């Protein structure tokens, strides 16, 4: 029977692939077979709704309807509105390779996943042979469909432990909780009462294994750093990288989170006369250099096409890359200056290599370029196609995840569908990377329709 075949499944060896990292090292990926991926997807669809109900609100990585933008918005809120200017930076050493299998299965049991057949399937999957390595005793392979969910399960205990130190700590007196129209609960009276105690104020924001703990005082940050290091070792068997971990005073230094460096700068004064601070953020130095190098690669590809169609594809690939960078980094407050610096640095190469192909007019602008870049005087055309200007970008304040959005409730799905009334920008990027040069225009919207997120959800 099918049930029996699932119970007796034999996991195939996982293919191991090393991909290069920006620092010159490599990241190991475990690539399961097609059949194993199918089974992992089935298991994921069973487990994810259960786990989602138990995850912490500020766990933003690898979760439906959440993104890096939501994590950055949460950090901005704590830094600027709450005045938490001391950050505990902790880098877990080889997180995915050091997850303890026994501990993970116990955490799943505690979260409510108590089907022993399912747990035995997961146990067998974790112990599946890895090509050229053998049978692992710990770790979950990066590259598996279910690995991100399991990573969140492991660190969910950390989220709630940090939360229990301040945010959700029980009090003797029950203070009123205000519910905003969007569903957000405000516990301001509780937190004001807690500030009069000796408790250490701390808030966690996490995206996958990258997390920040924000504190009001340096003394609290020092204690939290030591306590978190000990807790990770004792509870999860994980070590930290001392050279990548520490305490950052945002008034003096940057902290890096998800490719964005963040600090505060003094601006004006508060009502009580104390100095006011505002968030100041931009691309990390690593991301800045990577973008400059990538733009130069795209420029060379546009300068030496095999034919006109190949040149048009190179322009589309360039536009897709720049648009993706703009969409991600526009939530950095200082991104306009960063983009203009990069535009200035690559301007000479763009002019030198593409001068004979460049014009000030060309084909009709696609709507997505016309809306965002149509008013730019930096707009140029290469091979008749518009070239997105790197330096034309305005900051956009990051948004929080709407409370009502939830894939697993009818009301939440209705909210999701409201935002899908137009084509998602990721689809446009896909179409730009793979333009259909030899077909009629009428075919392209059909392809978009089949790939639209709304159809994928149905």
Where are these regions (language model features)?
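A conserved non-catalytic segment of reverse transcriptases
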Residues: 127, 132, 236-307, 314, ...
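Histidine-centered nuclease catalytic patch
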Residues: 440-458
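Non-catalytic, peripheral interaction segments enriched in hydrophobic/basic residues
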Residues: 314-369, 373
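Charged boundary/loop elements
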Residues: 45-58, 397
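Extended C-terminal regions of large enzymes
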Residues: 342, 354-442
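Duplex nucleic acid-engaging cores and interfaces of nucleic-acid transaction enzymes
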Residues: 34-42, 86
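Active/ligand-binding-proximal structured segments within catalytic/core domains
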Residues: 39-47, 150-154
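Conserved polymerase palm-domain catalytic core
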Residues: 3-17, 54-58, 63-66, 70-242, ...
